[in-house]
Amino acid sequence: MPEGPEIRRAADKLEAAVAGKPLTHVWFAFPELKAFEAQLTGARVERFETRGKALLTHFSCGLTLYSHNQLYGVWRVVKAGETPQTTRSLRVRLETEDAAVLLYSASEIEMLDADGVAAHAFLQRVGPDVLDMSLTVEQVKERLLSPRFHRRQFSGLLLDQAFLAGLGNYLRVEILWQAQLAPRHKAIELNNTQLDALARACLEIPRLSYQTRGTVDENKHHGALFRFEVFHRAGKKCRRCGGIIEKTTLSSRPFYWCPGCQA
């Protein structure tokens, strides 16, 4: 599943294509959304907002389209009037005079007003977004030490969107390598130096993944553009200590780490 940085990069592309322009054609596949097609035609997309792995499309009329791609959903940007040949099922089409954004294969799609956004179960449940630049290291440390999270092993905690929104498996792996921590640890066991290193990595690694631009190489995964240190590198040498990177399964996901420098 794409993680927070990839969802945010996709949102940037959608916003560049259609934001601020009147919608000339709106189409929804789901019957419960059909009534909104006429209401949204002529309105503008004001912005695309990410909340972890969820995407909120805010319209000038006050409505917001909630979507979550899960494993198979994908957005595409095409020219106005263009319909790509694909076996995917089209769910949403938002078109302006010169461009269209298409959502394929997603199953979680809802239209919300302001109260609906505030009360939405998933949006209420998710923690602060790691790509929210106002989120600080100290705030992450506070969450790590909170009674709700301080006894959770990092192998599971860093996948929990209630802790920090936008993290996922490759970020979990790279964050723990950066902080030199084994996945079995809990925040309550760490000293302040270790806590600080982990909190910094929880912000720096996702932001590096989002901000990095350039050529995608053989280390790519769901569009991540920065170099992996341990993810998908089982059997190779750790670039920090020279140890051999190992692979196992934790929280039902593949996990990579270096036993030589992740204590």
Curated annotation (Swiss-Prot):
Cofactor list: Zn(2+)
Chain positions of all zinc fingers (FPG-type): 229-263
Organism, scientific name: Cronobacter sakazakii (strain ATCC BAA-894) (Enterobacter sakazakii)
Superkingdom, natural source: Bacteria
Pfam families: Fapy_DNA_glyco (PF01149), H2TH (PF06831), zf-FPG_IleRS (PF06827)
Signal sequence range: none
Keyword NAD attributed: no
Protein name: Endonuclease 8
GO molecular function annotations of the record: class I DNA-(apurinic or apyrimidinic site) endonuclease activity; damaged DNA binding; oxidized pyrimidine nucleobase lesion DNA N-glycosylase activity; zinc ion binding
Cofactor note: Binds 1 zinc ion per subunit.
EC number of this enzyme: 3.2.2.-, 4.2.99.18
Record-annotated disulphide pairs: none
Family designation: Belongs to the FPG family.
Protein's UniProt keywords contain Hydrolase: yes
Ligand binding (DNA): 70, 125, 169
